């Protein structure tokens, strides 16, 4: 009986049930960096969510990156090769800790990019599933407080 209870109580063994609705823009907190405006992209099937940073230096299995003057050193987990308009953008993947909707998520894979994008932090489908939310494309900041755009180019 104990094995059955242990099996059922693990999230991975349960059918996905998303009864929380989020907006397509929400506030997400990246551990060590702070709050950021995130776009929940249901069409993003890449291996990692995308985060636009200022500098990236990959040497061996170590990634040194910088965003708004804050410096980070992370272990390289792999490389994402998303294609957009037939252009391939190589993004080193690192793991970060993220807080969303008062829940703390460890080892969230993010692909770092220095190319300017319409969104500073683009959440992929895997992370949306991990957040256990339905995304309403007509609403913003349903589960979190409003946060301004990082720059004038943000959507």
Question: What feature does the model see in each segment?
Answer:
Residues 1-7:
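Short acidic, low-complexity intrinsically disordered linear motifs used
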Residues 7-155:
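Pepsin/retropepsin-fold aspartyl endopeptidases
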């Amino acid at each position: 009986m104990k094995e059955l209870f242990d099996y059922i109580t693990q999230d991975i063994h349960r059918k996905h049930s998303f009864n929380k609705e989020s907006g397509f823009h929400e506030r997400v907190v990246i551990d060590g960096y702070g709050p950021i405006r995130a776009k929940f992209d249901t069409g993003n099937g890449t291996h990692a969510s995308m985060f636009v940073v200022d500098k990236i230096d990959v040497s061996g299995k170590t990634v040194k990156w910088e965003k708004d003057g804050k410096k980070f050193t992370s272990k390289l987990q792999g490389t994402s090769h998303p294609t957009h308009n037939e252009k391939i953008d190589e993004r080193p993947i690192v793991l970060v800790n993220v807080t969303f909707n008062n829940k703390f998520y460890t080892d969230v894979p993010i692909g770092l990019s220095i190319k300017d994008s319409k969104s500073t932090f683009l959440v992929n489908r895997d992370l949306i599933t991990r957040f256990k939310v339905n995304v309403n494309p007509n609403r913003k900041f349903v589960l979190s407080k409003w946060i301004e755009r990082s720059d004038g180019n943000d959507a």
